[in-house]
C-alpha cells in the first residue's frame, strides 16, 4: 500500500487557505452585523421622526390656519375663508334650487326637511333646558307638535304628541361638512371651528332654499323659527 505524505510546503498552503476562509467568514459576519446595526438605526430614526411629525401635525392643526405650498409659489395660506368657499361651491354643485325647479316632489320634500330640521333643533334646545330645571316637557312637546302640524308638515301622533316624520338634522348640512372635512381635515380638529363651520353651513343652506318657500302655503324657515321660539319662551320664562 502506498502511503501519501504531504510535504511541509503543501501543508502550509492548505493552512493558509483555511485561515483565509476563516478570515473571510469573520469579515462577512462582521459586515452583516454592521448592516443590521445600520438598518436598525434607520428604523429607530424613522420612528422618532414619525413621532415628531405627528406631534407637529397635532400642534399645527390646533391653530386657526396653516401654511403650505412650494418654494416657487411662496407659502399658500389655508384659512376659514378657504374652507367656507369650498362649502359654498359644494352647495352650488348640489344645486337644490335647480333640482327643485325640475321636480315638484323634490321641492316639497326639501321644504319639509328644512322645516323639520328647524323643529328638531328648537325642540332639543328647549327640552334640554327644561329637563335640566326639572320641568315637565310634555306640554311643550304637545304645543310645538301642534305648531308643526299646522304649518303642513307630515308626521304621526303618539301619546297626544305630533312629531314630524322628517324630524332630525338638516339633511344638507352633512354633505357640506363631510366634503370640507375630507378635503381640509386639519381645519376640523378644533371643536370651536367645527361649530363655526356648521353654523355657516346652516346659514348658506337657508339662503339657498329661501326662494322655495315663496310660492307655497308653508312659512319660511325664519318664520317657523319665530313661531317655535315664542312657544319655547312661554315655558322657559318660568324656569328658576
Curated annotation (Swiss-Prot):
Domain of life: Bacteria
InterPro entries: SopE, SopE-like_GEF_dom_sf, SopE_GEF_dom, SopE_N_dom
Molecular function GO terms recorded: GTPase activator activity; guanyl-nucleotide exchange factor activity
Signal peptide coordinates: none
Subcellular location: Secreted
GO BP terms: actin cytoskeleton organization
Residue ranges of the region described as GEF catalytic domain: 78-240
Listed transmembrane segments: none
A single GO cellular-component term on record: extracellular region
Alphabetically ordered keywords of this record: GTPase activation, Guanine-nucleotide releasing factor, Secreted, Virulence
Record NCBIfam families: PRK15279.1, PRK15280.1
Biological role stated in the UniProt entry: Activator for both CDC42 and RAC1 by directly engaging these Rho GTPases and acting as potent guanine nucleotide exchange factor (GEF). This activation results in actin cytoskeleton rearrangements and stimulates membrane ruffling, promoting bacterial entry into non-phagocytic cells.
Family of the protein in this entry: Belongs to the GEF (guanine exchange factor) SopE family.
Name this polypeptide is given: Guanine nucleotide exchange factor SopE
Organism, scientific name: Salmonella paratyphi A (strain ATCC 9150 / SARB42)
Amino acid at each position: 500500500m502506498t502511503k501519501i505524505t504531504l510535504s511541509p510546503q503543501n501543508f502550509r498552503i492548505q493552512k493558509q487557505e483555511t485561515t483565509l476562509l476563516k478570515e473571510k467568514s469573520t469579515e462577512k459576519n462582521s459586515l452583516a452585523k454592521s448592516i443590521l446595526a445600520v438598518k436598525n438605526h434607520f428604523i429607530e430614526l424613522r420612528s422618532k421622526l414619525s413621532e415628531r411629525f405627528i406631534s407637529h401635525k397635532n400642534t399645527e392643526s390646533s391653530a386657526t390656519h396653516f401654511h403650505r405650498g412650494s418654494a416657487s409659489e411662496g407659502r399658500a395660506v389655508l384659512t376659514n375663508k378657504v374652507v367656507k368657499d369650498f362649502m359654498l361651491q359644494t352647495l352650488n354643485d348640489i344645486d337644490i334650487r335647480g333640482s327643485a325647479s325640475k321636480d315638484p316632489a323634490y321641492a316639497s320634500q326639501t321644504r319639509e326637511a328644512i322645516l323639520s330640521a328647524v323643529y328638531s333643533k328648537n325642540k332639543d334646545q328647549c327640552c334640554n333646558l327644561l329637563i335640566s330645571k326639572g320641568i315637565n316637557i310634555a306640554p311643550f312637546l304637545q304645543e310645538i307638535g301642534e305648531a308643526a302640524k299646522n304649518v303642513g308638515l307630515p308626521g304621526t301622533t303618539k301619546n297626544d304628541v305630533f312629531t314630524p316624520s322628517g324630524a332630525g338634522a338638516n339633511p344638507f348640512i352633512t354633505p357640506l361638512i363631510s366634503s370640507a372635512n375630507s378635503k381640509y381635515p386639519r381645519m376640523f380638529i378644533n371643536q370651536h371651528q367645527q361649530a363655526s363651520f356648521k353654523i355657516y353651513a346652516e346659514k348658506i343652506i337657508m339662503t339657498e332654499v329661501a326662494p322655495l318657500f315663496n310660492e307655497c302655503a308653508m312659512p319660511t324657515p325664519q318664520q317657523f323659527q319665530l313661531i317655535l321660539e315664542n312657544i319655547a319662551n312661554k315655558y322657559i320664562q318660568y324656569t328658576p
